[in-house]
A protein has these predicted regions:
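Active-site diphosphate/adenylate-binding microenvironment
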Residues: 38, 50-104, 111-119, 124-125, ...
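Active-site glycine/GP-rich loop and adjacent strand/helix microenvironment
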Residues: 2-28, 38-50, 142-144, 151, ...
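Secondary-structure edge/capping motif, primarily at the C-terminal ends of alpha-helices
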Residues: 31-34
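Glycine-centered flexibility sites
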Residues: 66, 107-110, 236-237, 270
Length: 306
């Protein structure tokens, strides 16, 4: 891919970049297997130093805070990059011609859209698949998907679409993309439910919160049954695309309309600017795998600071 007017980068060290990607993937694998791995801090610090040398604009944050990258020892010492920066400039070490994906934000703030360029999507896939299997479907490795979103091929700049498309591939079930021309296709959903029931496959329905509002409106009070092991993943806000519904009320309406327990409605937190996702612990609690709770759980390769 190329991008008109892209900023010229300093010489990009591809082998060093790839070595960092491989370390991240190894860290993910070791964490999921419960094996000893290098520390989060040492990996994060090495990534920060590499990014500093790339002259992406991140180095200005260090200079503004008078931080010497050579003295970094903890991830908490690395300055956070404001999301607005992704709207104002390209944030990537690699040159634009090495982009394999360019994920764009929704542009709900001031109409500007941030961009997250990706060179090696395998690292993104590794973390996404690992944590989804832990939080969304720890009880099965195969399930069918009903996606309240347009097909990823029609929205190639959507990080959510990329994630959903990849999780469908990882779980080897059938995928039904149930949004056509901006409209929720209830008939397609009904057919997908029938087929999954005939094959005795568990189902997950996934999409943004506003898409579930559209689904509820399209149902007009009718109910659908996701089945005994059915679950829902909802994410994001309403982004001005539907009426706003209070979170608890929406959860209850979804559960009632799809005939599933409220703990089977799992909220996901993700951002285009991030490569990792956090999930509520409701479903794992309902399955008896841990104490039920409503907190968002981050993967070991993601750190939240306040």
């Amino acid at each position: 891919m190329t991008s008109p007017g892209s900023r010229a980068h300093c010489p990009f060290d591809l082998p060093a970049s790839q070595a960092l990607h491989e370390r991240v993937r190894r860290f993910i694998d070791h964490q999921m297997a419960g094996r000893q791995s290098e520390s989060f801090d040492s990996l994060a610090v090495d990534i920060a130093r590499f990014q500093f040398q790339c002259e992406t604009g991140v180095e200005k944050l260090y200079k503004a805070k008078n931080i010497d990258t050579g003295s970094l020892t903890l991830a908490s010492q690395i300055p956070a990059v404001p999301t607005d920066v992704f709207k104002l400039r390209r944030v990537a070490c690699h040159p634009a011609e090495l982009d394999t994906y360019r994920f764009l934000t929704s542009g709900t703030t001031l109409g500007a859209r941030g961009m997250h360029p990706v060179r090696d999507a395998d690292t993104y896939r590794r973390g996404t698949r690992a944590w989804a299997s832990q939080m969304l479907y720890p009880d099965t490795d195969r399930l069918d998907w009903i996606l309240l979103a347009p097909p990823f091929a029609d929205s190639p700049h959507s990080s959510l679409g990329f994630m959903l498309d990849d999780l469908c591939a990882a779980t080897q079930g059938q995928a039904t993309w149930a949004v056509l021309d901006g409209r929720v296709d209830v008939d397609a959903i009904s057919r997908a439910l029938y087929c999954a029931n005939q094959r005795q496959m568990p189902i997950i329905m996934a999409g943004a919160s506003f898409a579930f509002v559209h689904l509820l409106e399209a149902l007009q009070g009718r109910n659908l049954a996701l089945g005994q092991r059915g679950r829902v993943m909802q994410t994001g806000g309403f982004k001005g695309k539907s009426k706003e519904v209070e979170a608890l009320a929406l959860r209850e309406q979804i559960a009632r309309s799809l005939k599933i327990p409220t703990d089977a409605v799992i909220s996901e937190y993700g951002m285009t600017e991030l490569g990792s996702q956090a999930y509520e612990g409701r479903w794992r609690g309902w399955l008896g795998l841990e104490q039920p709770h409503e907190d968002f759980v981050c993967p070991p390769w993601m750190r939240v600071t306040t």
